[in-house]
């Protein structure tokens, strides 16, 4: 059951237990707060009132924490550029889902590494079957703010424990798997195993996932990225990027039948809030530092 006034006090009293989450899981708070901040800005890129509601409640809990990341979130100390990028990304992933549902209104969507995102509320067409998948500690928090129904379900599991697929496989499909800001924290062997299993278990499904340029995983660029994640964003030591690719079509080489459909970068957006940084979009290395690929898993 979602959080109500009657159980809010109890939830706050137990908050220290509920908020003991891994470094990688804590990144979901950054995404959530970016959504909330942008939603309250002038001419917002993303309209996410649920994020505003959740952060208003979390502020009452996180304000008592000595965690530097949590203090930054409560005090709104997130860089404007980060907020803009996260909001543009969420809007684009919503568009991917809406495009899928336009062709398959009763399709099945699995939001891998969902965090506290309210994508289901933003894209619900009244027919979609939607699964939010994330680590148990994240889903436990999410249950305080969202309610499941006959078309909206939680899966409390690591994406690497492939047993979660049996629940999704109960449906006929078609299937769309989205992984926004997830794969870069995993190892290549795990990402490859996951995608090959999705291809085997859900033939004909689509995958939309964010990827990172593997060149940035080599020194000295790797140290620069880790500095940004841990010293500037104050994420934990385990929240580091491990997986990357060089080319949008690279996953096609993993197995016959993996078909590249398209890709997307922040620089493809005509959003005015990107500002001067848009001038670097013509540089391929910059455009594809962190971007999104779309595949058909035949």
Where are each of the predicted segments found?
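A short, conserved alpha-helix within the catalytic core of class I
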Residues: 185-201
């Amino acid at each position: 059951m979602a959080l109500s006034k009657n159980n809010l006090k109890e939830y706050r009293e137990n908050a220290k237990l509920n908020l003991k989450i891994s470094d990688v899981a804590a990144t979901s708070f950054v995404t959530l707060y970016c959504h909330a901040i942008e939603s309250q800005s002038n001419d917002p890129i993303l309209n996410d009132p649920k994020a505003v509601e959740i952060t208003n409640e979390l502020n009452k809990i996180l304000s008592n924490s000595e965690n530097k990341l949590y203090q930054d979130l409560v005090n709104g100390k997130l860089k404007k550029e980060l907020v803009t990028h996260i909001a543009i990304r969420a809007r684009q992933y919503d568009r991917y889902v809406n495009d899928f549902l336009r062709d398959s209104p009763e399709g099945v969507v699995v939001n891998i590494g969902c965090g506290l995102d309210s994508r289901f509320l933003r894209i619900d067409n009244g027919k979609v079957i939607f699964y939010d998948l994330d680590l148990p500690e994240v889903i436990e928090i999410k249950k305080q703010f969202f309610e499941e129904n006959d078309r909206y379900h939680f899966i409390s599991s690591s994406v690497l424990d492939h047993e979660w697929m049996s629940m999704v496989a109960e449906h006929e499909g078609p299937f769309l798997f989205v992984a926004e800001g997830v794969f870069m924290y995993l190892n290549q062997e795990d990402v490859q195993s996951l995608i090959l299993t999705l291809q085997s278990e859900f033939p004909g499904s689509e995958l939309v996932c964010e990827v990172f340029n593997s060149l940035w995983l080599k020194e000295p660029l790797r140290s620069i990225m880790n500095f940004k994640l841990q010293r500037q964003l104050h994420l934990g030591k385990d929240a580091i990027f491990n997986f990357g690719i060089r080319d949008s079509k690279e996953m096609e080489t993993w197995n016959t039948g993996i078909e590249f459909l398209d890709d997307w970068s922040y620089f493809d957006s005509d959003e005015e809030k990107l500002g001067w940084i848009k001038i670097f979009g013509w540089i391929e290395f910059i455009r594809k530092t962190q971007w999104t690929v779309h595949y058909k898993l035949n």
